[in-house]
């Protein structure tokens, strides 16, 4: 059995000792941390989710190690605080003096839900989106990046043009990575992407809704190239987007492979 620690004894802090190899570490910290998170949703409510966190800082060449426990302490401090992109960026800024670091990155990947009304019946249901927030802090400056994967329907223009009836269509994932400046309206970015698919998706549809989405997609055919170009054009015009990358993957219903395209801007 371990003996109780005598408070008069000074325990050695090995990780704070000097390192003689003189090699800087660009990123060191913790990752794969599942931790509760409150996110301020588009309607202003606090949405409870579970995020997969990565917290890292740069370590100077002369220092042996960083203070790993302080990353978890930072998560605990904000566990009950509803998060906005601005507060998330502040959390990354706060991490630097806590770890005695000049640079650091904070990443949270989490499922996010939006309550949607079906297009005809109006029946409501949740739809989930995969979201990643990243804040890169250097001194007093913080760069915030939003990454969101939005599922949509795509219908092939060529298939429609050559067929007497019908056209092959499929579910597609459009992933936007955007460095944001100023106000960040995550729901608005999701809505922007959904508007550019052949049709958006819903969690629950009645028969009149199914008729609508079938005909909506048929009237709005798009190649994977159309998807990324149309979303990119909208992002270029967005006042809060500094730079972006748009990826689209169509899970082809007539092939055992996907169609894929990327636009960076």
From Swiss-Prot:
Q: What does this protein do?
A: Converts GTP to 7,8-dihydroneopterin triphosphate.
Tell me which EC number(s) this protein carries: 3.5.4.16
The record, for HAMAP family, names: GTP_cyclohydrol_B
Hey, where's the site called May be catalytically important on this chain? 156
Q: Does the keyword Hydrolase apply?
A: yes
Note the InterPro entries from the entry. GTP_cyclohydrolase_FolE2, GTP_cyclohydrolase_FolE2/MptA
Protein name as catalogued: GTP cyclohydrolase FolE2
Pathway as given in its UniProt record: Cofactor biosynthesis; 7,8-dihydroneopterin triphosphate biosynthesis; 7,8-dihydroneopterin triphosphate from GTP: step 1/1
Catalytic reaction list: GTP + H2O = 7,8-dihydroneopterin 3'-triphosphate + formate + H(+)
Q: Please give the biological process terms from Gene Ontology that the record holds.
A: tetrahydrofolate biosynthetic process
State the family named in the UniProt similarity comment for this chain. Answer: Belongs to the GTP cyclohydrolase IV family.
Which keywords annotate this record?
A: Hydrolase
Its gene name is folE2
The keyword Hydrolase appears for this protein:
yes
Organism domain of life:
Bacteria
Supply the source organism for this entry. Answer: Bordetella avium (strain 197N)
Q: Name one GO molecular function term.
A: GTP cyclohydrolase I activity
């Amino acid at each position: 059995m371990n003996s109780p620690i005598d408070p008069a004894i000074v325990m050695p802090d090995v990780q704070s000792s000097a390192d003689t190899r003189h090699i800087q570490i660009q990123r060191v910290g913790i990752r794969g941390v599942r931790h509760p998170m409150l996110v301020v949703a588009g309607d202003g409510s606090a949405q409870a989710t579970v995020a997969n966190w990565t917290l890292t800082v740069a370590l100077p060449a002369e220092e042996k190690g960083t203070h790993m426990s302080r990353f978890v302490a930072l998560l605990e401090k904000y566990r009950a605080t509803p998060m906005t992109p601005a507060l998330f960026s502040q959390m990354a800024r706060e991490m630097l003096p806590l770890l005695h670091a000049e640079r650091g990155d904070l990443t949270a990947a989490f499922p996010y839900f939006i309550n949607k009304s079906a297009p005809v019946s109006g029946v409501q249901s949740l739809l989930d989106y995969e979201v990643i927030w990243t804040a890169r802090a250097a001194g007093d400056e913080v760069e915030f990046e939003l990454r969101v994967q939005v599922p949509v329907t795509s219908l092939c223009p060529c298939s429609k043009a050559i067929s007497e009836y019908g056209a092959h269509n499929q579910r597609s994932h459009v992933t936007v990575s955007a460095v944001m400046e100023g106000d960040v309206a995550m729901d608005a970015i999701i809505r922007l992407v959904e508007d550019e698919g052949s049709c958006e998706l819903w969690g629950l549809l009645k028969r009149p809704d199914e008729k609508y989405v079938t005909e909506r997609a048929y009237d709005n055919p798009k190649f994977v190239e159309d998807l990324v170009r149309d979303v990119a054009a909208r992002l270029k015009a967005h006042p809060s987007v500094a730079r972006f990358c748009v990826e689209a993957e169509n899970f082809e219903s007539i092939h055992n492979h996907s169609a894929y395209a990327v636009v960076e801007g």
